[in-house]
Amino acid sequence: MPVDRIEIELADARSPDLINLVTALDNFLNKVCGVERNHGSPIDRLAHDDTQMFIARIAGQAVGCAGLQVFADGTGEVKRMYVVTEVRTTGIGSRLLTCVVEAALAAKLSVLRLETTEFLPDAQRLYRAKGFVPCPAYGPYVSNPINLYFERWLTK
């Protein structure tokens, strides 16, 4: 699939394309790291006003997604970051994460956090390249800190 015309757009969390991508992400995570480590938000949770979802498309085909959930304390979390296998390593993940960071900056958030797993070293490299550093478990993950957590401070 040629990747010269990548488009990223805001998406309705209940759109069929986003549902398909999130389903593919869940299937991938369950296979790679097990159901017990997949803390992904369900579609209904992503459809709230505090969450923006982005879809990456190539020639109209949905090939990736990522979201930003904004919390009342002025922090945010990267949600449901995924790129289909066939177009990984093409920069789509980087572009999606840039969109999420830009949305967090526009919302004047102080810090942006995310959860990942040791089973996704490529994702970890991307997060580090975008200025994220390891941090302790936070929010809903404190009681079950079995994955890896990263943050990027957006204000000084």
Which residues are covered by each model-predicted region?
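C-terminal "cap" of GNAT-fold acetyltransferases
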Residues: 2-6, 14, 110-113, 117-130, ...
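Short coil/turn segments at alpha/beta junctions that flank glycine-rich nucleotide-binding fingerprints
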Residues: 74, 90, 106-110
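Active-site acidic-Proline motif in GNAT/NAT acetyltransferases
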Residues: 84-86, 90, 118
